[in-house]
Amino acid sequence: MPRWRNGRRSGLKIRFPYGSGGSNPFLGTTFDVILEAPLMNPLVRRISNLDLIRGIALLGILGMNAISFGLPWAAYWNLSAAGSETWLDFAIGVFCEIFLDQKMMGLFSLLFGTSIVLLVDAAKERGYRRPVLLSVWRNLLLFIIGIIHSLFWDGDVLRLYAICAPIVLLLRNSRPRLLVAFGIFLVVGPATLTLLLQPLFLSDGSLDMTTNWAMNVGDGIGLGKYWFVESSTFGATVGLFFLLDNLGRALGMMLIGVALYRMNILHGNRSLRFYRLVAITGLLIGLPLSSIGTGWLVTSDFANTIALVSLIPNTLATIPTVLGYIGLISIWDSKVKNRLHTHISAIGRMALSNYLLQTVLGIVILRVVFEQGTLGRSQIALFVIFVWALQLIWSKPWLDKFSYGPCEWILRKLYRW
């Protein structure tokens, strides 16, 4: 008999008996039938592949965010700026640049775009008259949460995502190919501007005040804290670039996420051959590009003269690497459903709670318990592993008892009020 849990029935299984085989694909197959009270939740099953991708992305994001918790911002981009005193520190920094930087945030942004479409579609199925307005209200709440979050850490992405969300809503029904093309343009376009911006800076990283641009901008800060530990601000030129770059990469990946969802790629139910092709092709293109960009910086001893243009290879690598990761994760989701899979998926289902928890732990441990800038990358990596273990341990038991994470529950109550 089906069991009632939190106002909905679950656990009903239909099993077709084993037979002699033939061509019937249903023989020996067990189906989980989710029976939910119609007024409680939409008749939509969670897509396990999305939860798994989101969980892995969130864990990977911490690998980069922890650098900004424990070290000055310059160390995030410039490995020689701080935190790389030993060969192990440096090796960890190179690994993160190649495998994590931009890629994990790209995965996370991609899934955020998908979640916007999922919410609107689910609201329509439930009979909401204004599903788009519901999504706008939800993202306004996320923006408010992001403002509060940014008071403690200036690397918050919730505000950025909330700003991009209305554009995703406007374009969500566009053709997938158009969304992909526009998304690629938004991701790659801002990075190409570095070809114009890099000549504005002198070899010492200061702004060339003889140029028309510098005379109009007039702050004279140069690369600022993007590249130098001793600087406390980005400066107008670098700040404007990162504003455009962050908006472009976030919105671009969201639109690509909508396209991949419409193309039935993110569900994880394409053939294994398809996902193998995506994984191999994406990683063979993306990882060498990231390696070239990182190698360029290392061999130049992180020269000021390539501080901005060196971003181009890694940006070009983002989309193919993200697709490669999606291929690998989808293969895992379809072939192996072990305890690790279950616990990482639980992290993905509680992404907002776990994202905010990472910040709380990062600020408390890496800035209060230990003074910022006193730890190396290898020591910060131990913090990352600790938080991973904590979130792997607590997320699944929480969801066994409750339907949502604590922050997800609060957000849900507010936007469905």
PLM features: residue spans?
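Short, positively charged low-complexity motifs
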Residues: 3-6, 19-23
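Functional transmembrane helices that form membrane-embedded active or gating regions
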Residues: 46-57, 278-280, 333-361, 403-415
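Solvent-exposed interhelical
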Residues: 130, 167-185, 259-281
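Alpha-helical transmembrane segments of multi-pass integral membrane proteins
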Residues: 301-401
